[in-house]
């Protein structure tokens, strides 16, 4: 076994497959929050495993870690391509990336371009300027219209980013698949 496995054992608190009633509640919340019919994506009766970590829960649906519940907020993981591609895009300059990947919130000066419209509290996908790769999922603290006008200050709360605890668990879950 390699080191990462033992490290992850300390992060993962417990894991189990959820019941039908829990699945219905999760799918209802999923449809409300993300505006997509989950049964079309996953089927009528998918296998859903919940992994409890320090910050919240990761939902592994049909073997793919696609959703997270962080402090009551349901968000897609960075590997859930079907959903994150529908989120508004925010392109940040290369100087902001190390800070974002260390958990920093997104500041107005680091934003190069905003693609799409959103309101305060909506989720957005943070992309790097050079490669266009997804590096974070963040919650808007202001509307897209207001953010475009700002030159300074915090504009997004970083919820899930490349390198966080959830990301490490997700990478280990998808390794070899």
Which residues does each PLM region occupy?
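Beta-strand/loop-dominated core regions that host nucleotide or nucleotide-derived cofactor-binding catalytic loops
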Residues: 6-56, 61-113, 117-120, 124-177
């Amino acid at each position: 076994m390699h080191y990462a496995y033992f490290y992850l054992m300390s992060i993962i608190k417990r894991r189990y497959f959820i019941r039908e009633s829990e699945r219905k509640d999760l799918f209802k919340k999923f449809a409300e929050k993300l505006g997509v019919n989950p049964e079309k994506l996953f089927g009528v009766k998918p296998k859903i495993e919940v992994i409890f970590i320090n910050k919240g829960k990761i939902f592994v649906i049909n073997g793919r870690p696609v959703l997270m519940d962080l402090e009551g907020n349901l968000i897609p993981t960075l590997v859930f391509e079907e959903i994150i591609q529908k989120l508004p895009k925010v392109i940040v300059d290369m100087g902001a990336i190390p800070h974002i990947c260390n958990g920093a919130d997104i500041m107005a000066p680091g934003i190069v371009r905003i693609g799409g419209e959103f309101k305060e509290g909506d989720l957005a996908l943070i992309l790097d300027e050079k490669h266009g790769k997804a590096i974070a999922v963040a919650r808007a603290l202001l509307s897209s219209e207001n953010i475009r006008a700002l030159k300074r200050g915090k504009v997004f709360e970083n919820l899930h980013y490349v390198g966080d605890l959830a990301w490490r668990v997700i990478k280990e879950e998808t390794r070899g698949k």
